[in-house]
Regions:
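Long beta-strand-rich cores associated with HINT superfamily self-processing modules
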Residues: 536-561
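Aromatic- and charge-enriched surface segment that lines or borders ligand/interaction sites
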Residues: 72, 108-163, 195, 283, ...
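Ligand/substrate-recognition segments at binding pockets and active sites
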Residues: 246, 360-362, 372, 389, ...
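Extracytoplasmic/peripheral linker and loop segments enriched in polar/acidic and small residues
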Residues: 48, 353, 412, 426-441, ...
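Structural transition elements
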Residues: 239, 328, 334, 345, ...
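N-terminal lobe/hinge region of extracytoplasmic solute-binding protein
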Residues: 58-117, 232-236
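Gly/Pro-rich hinge or "lid" segments in bacterial periplasmic/extracellular proteins
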Residues: 91-96, 172-173, 177-192, 198-264, ...
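Ligand-site clamp/hinge motif
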Residues: 223-233, 255-303, 421, 430
Length: 561
């Protein structure tokens, strides 16, 4: 899967997104203590957690950045989660239980019942924990002013990719247009109180505010490092950044002043970089590493599952995610809706699933299974080469056309997109396939008039369809550096999205998001191809291992036996 951050999940019930927003959680940030058998979504050991030891994880690519204001790749967020924290986080549990919001640096999740949310849904009040400090060498207490600085820094960054999530905060628009010196709707009332005011109710706001973009940073540390801050991260989390050796490793060490008693369990996390998934699997089986950040290679899954020793260490779950083919509407011939519709009929999704040894599910709509708004059984575009050829003829291309097709070099993408290339050739479209490194590809996708068509992956940030519409289909994201790789947007969709975001009736809101799918399907800026399944492994020396529905692999909760 290409370019972004990751989200793992057992399929979440459609009503879950709204249950999350009403949760009044009493627990603080904390870990699971084990229980359950290996190879399931229960933690990997019933042993009592122990302190000490180093955990090594493998990844093919290194982060694009470790600055929470701008980072949005898979590995970026997994490493940042160990370093930085925000007001809230998701419960450290597998499955649906892990999609529940709990307090982190705030003392509770705001709700109407506890007085943290106004009855009209417009104002949220967060009370900070006292005594939480930034990591060494800053070593000072975190205050509400730090959260205001961090939020405004993120919203003012020219490279911030997710500002569209927070445009509902009063004053955000004026601040971004440099018509105001601050965001008036984000106030530090006193040292321990933050008050956020929205222009209209937004049932997804707490989930959006829990993303890494809103984690707190220390102003003096950011100013000390300037543009190099992304290589010198510092937050309040359980692990401290030690070093980043490009192309080799990133090392984090235990935060001795971490605020949560007894955490973390590990002394060190060693992220080993640049290992291909097959090489990483061999290193895990020889005891050199402890977990596969990129998962078990699909070609090796049958062999691994046939061996009882390794099968017991395998963890698998569907992702609330989609792999698409984007088509850049700024570039010919993809500015023609009939061409986009034609290619939507041309791709054989079932073949893509077979090429991944069943580690995916065919998909014919724009929300993944498990995301509110997904409609079971709904097919917008199936596999019909004859219909594709007819639409191409209707568009003035009876003999097809030549174009470029792009993907990254991460297995299994080159093989999958060779299959797509063959499908397009079968309807007369001669696509020259070009692969490039993940980070290069990610950066070029956000550059206007650069990539004509190619692979694009989107993974759940939080369980609400606004996490799909805002980044992928909105005007705000169809900008340089944005996530809307097709650069398509529609005034009609913008109006529907604005209306849905202000709705307080969960059922009516989801119905509105379902209607958006129909409009998107008619314009076909992306071709939904498949929904991936994640399969990974840990070593037999790893305790507490499970796959989190949001954070995926989460060493902040594991220990070494």
């Amino acid at each position: 899967m290409p370019p972004r951050k990751t989200r793992k999940s057992k399929t979440l019930a459609p009503a879950l997104a709204f249950a999350l927003l009403l949760t009044l959680a009493l627990a603080a940030c904390g870990g699971t203590s084990g229980g359950g058998s290996s190879g399931s979504q229960s933690p990997s050991s019933s042993d009592t957690p122990v302190q000490g030891g180093t955990m090594s994880l493998s990844y093919l690519t290194e982060p694009s950045s470790l600055d929470p204001a701008v980072a949005w790749n898979i590995i970026d967020w997994q490493i940042e989660h160990a370093i930085y924290q925000g007001m809230l986080q998701y419960a450290p549990k597998p499955g649906d239980a892990g999609a529940v919001l709990i307090p982190c640096l705030a003392t509770e999740v705001p709700s109407v019942q506890n007085g943290g949310m106004s009855a009209d849904g417009l104002t949220y009040t967060f009370t900070l924990r006292k005594g939480v400090t930034f990591q060494p060498p800053v070593n000072r207490e975190v205050t509400a002013q730090d959260f205001k600085y961090s939020f405004e820094r993120m919203m003012s960054s020219p490279r911030a990719p997710a500002t569209s999530f927070y445009m509902g905060v009063v004053g955000a628009d004026a601040f971004m247009k440099k018509k105001a010196a601050e965001i008036s709707g984000f106030q530090a009332v006193d040292d321990y109180t933050v008050e956020i005011t929205l222009k209209s109710p937004d049932l997804s706001f707490l989930n959006a505010f829990t993303m890494e973009f809103c984690d707190v940073v220390a102003r003096e540390w950011v100013e000390k490092w300037g543009k190099q801050f992304n290589r010198h991260p510092l937050g309040t989390g359980p692990f401290i950044f030690e070093k980043w050796t490009p192309g080799q490793e990133i090392v984090l060490t235990r935060n001795p002043s971490y605020w949560e008693p007894g955490k973390p369990y590990l002394d060190k996390i060693d992220y080993q970089l640049s290992f291909s998934p097959p090489t990483a699997l061999l290193k895990l089986q020889s005891g050199e590493i402890d977990a596969l950040g990129d998962g078990v290679p699909p070609a090796d899954i049958p062999r691994v599952m046939a061996d009882p020793q390794w099968k017991a260490l395998v963890y698998s779950q569907p992702l609330v995610a989609i792999s698409y083919m984007f088509m850049n509407v700024q570039m010919k011939p993809f500015d023609d809706v009939k061409v986009r519709q034609a290619l939507s009929w041309a791709i054989n999704r079932d073949k893509l699933v077979k090429l991944q040894a069943g580690q995916a599910m065919s998909l014919w709509q724009f929300y993944p299974k498990g995301m509110p708004g997904h409609e079971d059984g709904k097919v917008f575009y199936g596999y019909d080469p004859a219909k594709a050829r007819q639409l191409l003829a209707d568009a003035g291309y009876p003999d097809g056309f030549e174009t470029m097709l792009y993907t990254d070099n991460v297995d299994p993408n080159p093989k999958l997109w060779q299959s797509v290339q063959a499908d397009l050739a079968a309807v007369g479209v001669k696509a020259d396939l070009k692969t490039m490194s993940n980070n290069t590809y990610y950066n070029q996708q956000g550059t206007p008039n650069t990539l004509t068509a190619g692979s694009f992956g989107w993974w759940m940030d939080f369980p609400d369809p606004s996490d799909w519409i805002g980044p992928l289909f909105s005007k705000a994201s169809a900008v340089p550096g944005g996530m809307n790789s097709s650069f398509w947007w529609s005034p009609a969709l913008e109006a529907m999205f604005t209306e849905a975001q202000a709705m307080t009736d969960p059922e009516a809101r989801i119905a509105k998001f379902s209607a958006m799918q129909q409009l998107i399907s008619e314009e076909a800026p992306y071709v939904p191809c498949y929904q991936p399944i994640q399969t990974t492994m840990c070593s037999e020396n790893t305790g507490g291992f499970f796959l989190h529905p949001v954070y995926q692999i989460d060493p902040t909760q594991y220990w070494k036996k």
